[in-house]
Amino acid sequence: MNQQLIPAIKVKDLSFYYNTSKAIEGISMDIYRNKVTAIIGPSGCGKSTFIKTLNRISELEGPVKVEGVVDFFGQNIYDPRININRLRRQIGMVFQRPNPFPMSIYENVAYGVRISAKLPQADLDEIVESALKGAALWQEVKDKLNKSALGLSGGQQQRLCIARALAIKPKVLLMDEPCSALDPIATMKVEELIHSLRSELTIAIVTHNMQQATRVSDFTAFFSTDESRIGQMVEFGVTTQIFSNPLDSRTRDYVSGRFG
C-alpha cells in the first residue's frame, strides 16, 4: 500500500445517541478511497450503528443525536444544509438480509434511477445492464428481467440489491453483514464482487466473520464496548497488521478467539 491514501470519509470524534441512550462514543477513523475497510467486533459493540451514521440512514429508525463530524469529500454530512437524498445516492447501502422490492428484476435496478432522473428507455436499459454486470448477475438474469425478483435465490437477491445500489453510481458502498444470511457459495460470489468493485468504489463492510475480513479488506477497525456497554473503536490499521500484530491486547484477544 505505497500509493497515496485519500480519505473518502473522515470520521472525527463521533458519538451517536438513540434518543438519549449513547450507542457509540468518540470514534475517529478514515475510510480510504478505493479501499475496503472492514469493521469487526463482538455483538452489541456498535458496528452496525456506526456504519448507518455514515449516510444518515440511522435517522430513519427514530429520534437520534449526533456529536462530532463525518466528513465526506470535504463536507460534513451532518451540516443542516446537506441534501440527504443526494447524500444517500452518493453513499449507498446494502443490508444484512436481501431486501428486493416486490417487482421485476429490471424495475428493482431501475427504481432509484427513475426517482432521481427521467431518462430515455435506451439509457435506462444501459444503466440496468451495466449495474447487473457490475454485480456479477447479468448472465444469470438477462433472459428473465421481467420476472419477479422474489423468485431469485438468496445470493442472487443480495447481488440484485448490490446492483440496485450500483445503478445510481455511488462513490461509497456501505455493507452491513451482507453475507450473514447466505450460504458459502453465495458468500464467495459476494466476496469476489467486493474485490472487483474496489477499483471503482470505496467500500466499508461490517462483518462478524473474521476470516471474511482478512479475505476482502485492506483496513480493519476493531470495535468493542466499555463497562457501560457503549461502543468504541479500539484499534484501526492495515488488515494484515490488525490480525497478525495488533497493538491493543483487547484486539489480540478478539482476533485470537479469546472473547467475542
Curated annotation (Swiss-Prot):
GO terms for molecular function: ATP binding; ATP hydrolysis activity; ATPase-coupled phosphate ion transmembrane transporter activity. Keywords: ATP-binding, Cell inner membrane, Cell membrane, Membrane, Nucleotide-binding, Phosphate transport, Translocase, Transport. This is Phosphate import ATP-binding protein PstB 5. Its main location: membrane. Residues 9-255 form the ABC transporter domain. The complex is composed of two ATP-binding proteins (PstB), two transmembrane proteins (PstC and PstA) and a solute-binding protein (PstS). Part of the ABC transporter complex PstSACB involved in phosphate import. Responsible for energy coupling to the transport system. InterPro entries: AAA+_ATPase, ABC_transporter-like_ATP-bd, ABC_transporter-like_CS, P-loop_NTPase, PstB-like. The keyword Translocase applies. SUPFAM superfamilies: P-loop containing nucleoside triphosphate hydrolases. It catalyses: phosphate(out) + ATP + H2O = ADP + 2 phosphate(in) + H(+). Belongs to the ABC transporter superfamily. Phosphate importer (TC 3.A.1.7) family. Transmembrane segments: none annotated. Its EC number is 7.3.2.1. NCBIfam families: 3a0107s01c2 (TIGR00972), PRK14258.1 (NF010851). It is a peripheral membrane protein.
